Amino acid sequence: MDFTTNILLSIIVFLGIVLLLVALLLWVRNKLMPKGEVKITINDDKVLTVPTGNTLIATLAEQKVYLPSACGGKGSCGQCKCRVVEGGGTILPTEVGFFTRKQIQDHWRLGCQVKVKENLKIVVPQSILNVKEYECTVVSNRNVATFIKEFKVQLPAGEHMDFVPGSYAQIKIPKFDINYADFDKELIGEEYLPSWEKFKMFDLHCVNTEPTIRAYSMANYPAEGDVFMLTVRIATPPFKPDRSGFMNVNPGIASSYIFSLKPGDKVIMSGPYGEFHVKEHDTTEGGPSTNSGTANSQLSTLNSKLPEMIWVGGGAGMAPLRAQIMHLTRTLNVRDREMHYFYGARALNEVFYLQDFLQLEKDFPNFHFHLALDRPDPAADTQGVKYTAGFVHNVMYDTYLKDHKAPEDIEYYMCGPGPMSAAVVNMLDNLGVAPENILYDDFGGGAPKKSN
């Protein structure tokens, strides 16, 4: 038997063993994997009959019950929390870090980590049952800053969505292969094209090999109609060590997809989600009233006994803060509650919705807009735009909180980059502000950590 024949026989034997092992694994899986249908009881009320084998979050989505998920069901955001009071097995190591010991005892789980193998009884927030999925039409998708788009889509005709300002939406991201060179340059805008060309943005390429989901805060408030409006920052790859260009890794999947869309395109959105809402308060002696419980139940007048409010934002974190502020002013006409908005940006041309907030200052004596730019900006000086040079947490302290009589009594609402949020929390902690007075937009990453 010659050498070539030996090689061929070895390959045939090897492939035969591999095929036998694969067949064995499939047989074992078929025997061990439960078949048929089971029942999922939601909140001791709604009963679903579903097939086995998939994750709880995916199974519920097939039944039009949408648990939130900022990571596409990969177990990294911790947003798809629910109580699994019967069935579901024991909590997995991948879930433990998202819950306190008390929550684990109360059967809290991540929907993306629970396999549907048996009858389940689960408890979810009632608001989850009001979430709907829509096929929306892109209305506009223009750049409002160098790397940030205002992405606006219209709900289908006849559809209406009740939501509380500060909520977020989810967008389905399909498989794709996108070249940034194909982006519509008119939608980016002449003002921002030089920076895109300088950083060779149009050389980037992004591939998404499996459908996923991402979450974004809504910048719109209810009076603006049946739309989703998001502010989305493009997530570029990191720079090479020598700063000669971007590293050869995928840009952000969701932001690449959104930046590629044009008016008229169809997208799948769901919402509303989230609990980043203006706090409820007692405003009368007769009992509790609300200024944020539902879009239709908010009071048109609020009295001066309510605490002062401060919003702190940066970058695309503008979205939910704009929604809350515009709703309180333009819709509810709140004039007897002190309100301040501190917004940080690198330069004036990175600040969007500026004219809206400057006009609010004129129309509402109780509203004050504070702009913080990283460094002195000649463009802002030339245009006469009022700002303070420095990072937003320092500007907030030096120009206002340092001399405030009771900063611990203020309500703080925050959304922005992680380092900004951490710096603000650390500063407020040093001023004696209790954690319950600091609200932040969060997709499962946990509260911003104080620095040591």
Kindly give the residue locations of the regions a language model identified.
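Reductase modules of NAD(P)H-dependent flavoproteins
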Residues: 2-73, 84-105, 276, 298, ...
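Fe-S ferredoxin-like electron-transfer domains
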Residues: 21-27, 31, 97-159, 179
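Residue-level marker of beta-strand positions
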Residues: 55, 79, 121, 168, ...
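Cysteine-centered iron-sulfur cluster-binding motifs in ferredoxin-type domains/subunits
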Residues: 69-78, 111-115
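Ferredoxin-reductase
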Residues: 137-265, 346, 374-376
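Short Gly/Ser/Thr- and charged-rich N-terminal loops/segments
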Residues: 289, 293
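Intrinsic disorder
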Residues: 297-300, 304
